[in-house]
Swiss-Prot record:
Residues of the SPR domain: 154-267
Annotated protein name in UniProt: Protein sprouty homolog 3
Protein family according to the UniProt entry: Belongs to the sprouty family.
Gene: Spry3
Induction (UniProt): By FGF signaling.
Role this protein plays: Inhibits neurite branching, arbor length and neurite complexity. Inhibits EGF-mediated p42/44 ERK signaling. Negatively regulates the MAPK cascade, resulting in a reduction of extracellular matrix protein accumulation. May function as an antagonist of fibroblast growth factor (FGF) pathways and may negatively modulate respiratory organogenesis.
């Protein structure tokens, strides 16, 4: 058993001979360009030194020739393979620590930047000049045709009827408006559903307008509604509630519509563009 241990120990090369062998190995050495890059970055230096030490500590390296095997000196018998490997690992760890200590910069040498430089100050836009520019652009495109009698604009957006406000509810499934509240409050929705299922003509609009006075089966519709009102008395409140809704619509339109509301035909005046702040300035010149 002692003879086999001595033979194995004799096959292990010393570190000096491994370094000389590594220096003459063409397959392990790297080209000069990566070497320069490794010298410039500390992380690559640490990796290359660790690889060199790993190659130096490999116990499975074999001698290149028989002459190198004869040049090995016999080791004492009281040394074991575990003690040799432990001493080599300790020397490797100590050298790695010294290398890392030399590469790591001292905390006093460089200061850590914790705050980023602020962005450059942008020029502030004058609010008054911006408002005047937007106002001049708005006057140049809107309110060009002014009524000669009331002094209001006669364009289509200004003279359009303003409906009562409405909104969508339940993920845009239900329309909440004055018309829908009137239909559900007076049970007219039940009459519409009944006319829709009982109608045989697809083009018949009796389900959409059951209370209209049109010629499309007017007598039958009103007779059916009179019969249904016996079971649904709330249908009798539909016509007066409809009149109140129409009055509310007229009042809201008179307050919200900015355009001309003249009933009779009046002359149209082309307004001269000016920087006046009034929404409807007086006419400056007439159109030819």
């Amino acid at each position: 058993m002692d003879a086999t241990v001595i033979d194995e120990l004799q096959q292990i090369l010393p570190i000096e001979q491994l370094r000389s062998t590594h220096a003459s190995n063409d397959y392990v050495e790297r080209p000069p360009a990566p070497c320069k890059q490794a010298l410039s970055s500390p992380s690559l230096i640490v990796q290359t030194h660790k690889s060199d030490w790993s190659l130096a500590t490999m116990p499975t390296a074999l001698p290149r020739s028989i002459s190198q095997c004869h040049q090995l000196q016999p080791l004492p018998q009281h040394l074991s393979q575990s003690s040799i490997s432990s001493s080599m690992s300790q020397s490797t760890t100590a050298s790695d620590q010294r290398l890392l200590a030399s590469i790591t910069p001292s905390p006093s040498g460089q200061s850590i930047i914790r705050t980023q430089p602020g962005a450059g100050a942008h020029p502030k836009v004058d609010g008054a000049l911006k408002g005047e520019a937007e106002q001049s652009v708005g006057h140049s495109s809107d309110h060009l045709f002014i009524c000669e009698e009331c002094g209001r604009c006669k364009c289509v957006p200004c003279t359009a009827v303003r409906p009562l406000p409405s909104c969508w509810m339940c993920n845009q499934r239900c329309l909440c408006s004055a018309e829908s509240l009137l239909d559900y409050g007076t049970c007219l929705c039940c009459v519409k559903g009944l006319f829709y299922h009982c109608s045989t003509d697809d083009e018949d609009n009796c389900a959409d307008e059951p209370c209209s006075c049109g010629p499309s089966s007017c007598f039958i519709r009103w007779a059916a509604m009179s019969l249904i009102s016996l079971f649904l008395p709330c249908l009798c409140c539909y016509l007066p509630t409809r009149g109140c809704l129409h009055m509310c619509q007229q009042g809201y339109d008179s307050l919200r519509r900015p355009g001309c509301r003249c009933k009779r035909h009046t002359n149209t005046v082309c307004r001269k563009i000016s920087s006046s702040s009034s929404p409807f300035p007086k006419a400056q010149e007439k159109s030819v």
